[in-house]
Amino acid sequence: DGKPLLMVYLGTPTFITDRNPLEVWNDDRFTVRYVTGFITEQSSLRDSETLESIYGYWSWEDRGAQTFAVNQETKQPEAMTIVAAYRAQGEPGDADYIPASGRQNGKIFREEWARARLIGVKTALVVSWNEFVIGEQIDEERSKDLEPNTVYGDEYYQLLKEEIKLFKHK
């Protein structure tokens, strides 16, 4: 749009679940997008089959299958989150259980980038750089951090550069 992007975080879970938050507040000086986390875990915010964000919410992180946002005016795919790995959510047997997915030597990261290209989103939100939160970083395999470290060296930094190049030239 040529306007500055203003991302408004409404918390996780979000408190606006019954309508497009742009109906609550918008500002024509900006491209306003509302953000929440883990749309995969907020069933009222996504289509269960397509995983499209119902009200155009951008997700700053997802566990499990990637959700994606669609521009509410143009109806074009707009944004998707990409992670290298994720921890489990819930307990096996629970209806909302999401099993963990390790890095698998970069396979998960590459697959998530491939899905972003396939869906055709304009914006990829890459999680995470330097997040040293114990609950989220279970071990090296399920850590979503991409910064160079003693375990992987700069492997994921190089992979990130490679995938960004592919994404920009899709």
Question: What kind of feature is each model-predicted range?
Answer:
Residues 1-170:
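Glycan-processing catalytic domains of CAZymes
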